[in-house]
Structure formats: C-alpha cells, structure tokens
Amino acid sequence: MATFAHDVFSNLIANIFSSLILLIAGFLVGRWSDYTRQTRSFRRIFGKRAGKSSDLLIVLDSIQDTRLLPEPQRHTIGIQNPAGSNLTQRFFKAFPDGHITTIPGPMESLLPECSARGAAYLIEAFRGVRGISAKTTPDKTASLKWNGTFITLGSSYSNIKTDDIKNLPENLWLVDDAGKFTFRDGTAIQVEQRYDKGLVMKLNNPHTDGQTLIVCEGLGEWGTSGSAWFLASQWRKLSKRFGKNPFLICLSVTVGTDESAREVKAFGVEHWMWRMKKYFHLACL
C-alpha cells in the first residue's frame, strides 16, 4: 500500500514537473517566434542595418523667423516686416488661466508642433522593437549624410532632407508637394475643407546597402503628424504588404485627429502573398 501511494505521488510530481517544462518551453518558443517575426518585419521596411549597425534617424524640419533676416534677404524673397514689429519680444504664450506672456523665442530655428508629435509617435513605436534605438536630428545636419536610415518629417519646402529624397532618381512617383501632391501619373491630391492630406514614401537608400529613406509629410500640419502616426502604427502591415519594395501611400487626415489617417491612393509593387490574399478576399465578397 505504501509502495502504491509512493508511486502515485512520484507520478504526480513527474507530471507536474513535465507540464511546467512544456509550459515554459512553449512560452519561450512563442516569445522567440514573436521576436524573430517582428525583427524580420522591421528589417523589411526599415532596412537590415537600421538602428543596429547604423543610425535610425528621425529628421526634424525647422523654420526660421523672417524678422531675423537681414533687409537684403527679406527684399530678395519679397518679405516685409509688419509695421511696428518688435524684435525683442517676437512670440507670445497663452496659458489656461488666461494670462499671456511674451518671449523673445529662439534666435535660430523653430520646430513645428506637428513634427514634435510625429517624432513622439515613431520613437514610441520603435521602443517596442528589441535592440532598436532611434535618434532625432535636425534637417541641416541630416542633409550632409546618407549613411543611415532616415525618416523625414515635413515637406520638401520645410525639410532639407525631404527635398534631397524627392529629387532622387529612385523617386518614381512624387513630382512636387507645393500646395498639392502631384504625381508622375498625372494625378494630383489637394487639401479639403475638413481634411489635410498626408504622404508616406519609402525608397531604398541608393548610397548604402541595408538602409532605407522614408518621408512622412503633409499638406497641412495634421497631414504631417497623421502620416507619422500611420507609419508608427501600420509599419508591420506595410511590411507584409510591400516587403522590401519601395512604396508611396497618400492619406486623408481629419483636421485635429492624427489617428483618423486613412489611405486614399497607393503606389508600389505589393508582395505576391498580399496580392493573393486580396484577390481571394474580393472573390469571396
């Protein structure tokens, strides 16, 4: 009887121990599978070297106060100072309690609020990818470099690096972004009363292997931050859809709501598996 009880107890302990081993092994395998799948998705869209062996740079646009320009430069570009402008207190800040302060402001460059929002979306998204770190850099600094993966925020009229990328021969789609997006197929997209427009374009970096160039820009400030939100939240899906291929996605963004960004036009060669899934989905409708 004692031997039987001992055998039952031993079998119970062995079963519990083996179950724990299987549970832990399954958990670790699942985590490893998630990690490798996420890493592969990240590398397909941002490049195999991005954020590890080379920089992953979020390039911020900057603008300057025209009142600081010398008179000859203002005259050249057709800008006149407003009457009675005060160069010592150029900006104001309104507080919730109603009081207002005046400040000189920066003497060199200003960062648009939409670019700050966009950078925050991207940095938060990349924090979830193990081993990946992103840095922000001003467009003036980034314009001197090509070694790295660059994500630019702002149009070619406010971000020097966006202008550099727009003028690459590898850009097969975007002609210009001055007031409207004009494309090489002859189409154009403009801002509507309630909707800004955004654009996410990815090119493979022609100057270095394993790195990419991505533009997040907008017609209207919500177009810029909305496009950055779209990339930050949808990069895994974009990776499945396009693989390593270049692409351009045009977006419509409700003013005041970055998370409303939705696709209205797309260019690029989709992965064959994505096309097959889309075909079967349409066939079943």
Regions found by a protein language model. Give the residues of each.
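Solvent-exposed alpha-helical segments and adjacent loops
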Residues: 32-285
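Hydrophobic, helix-forming membrane-interacting segments
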Residues: 1-38
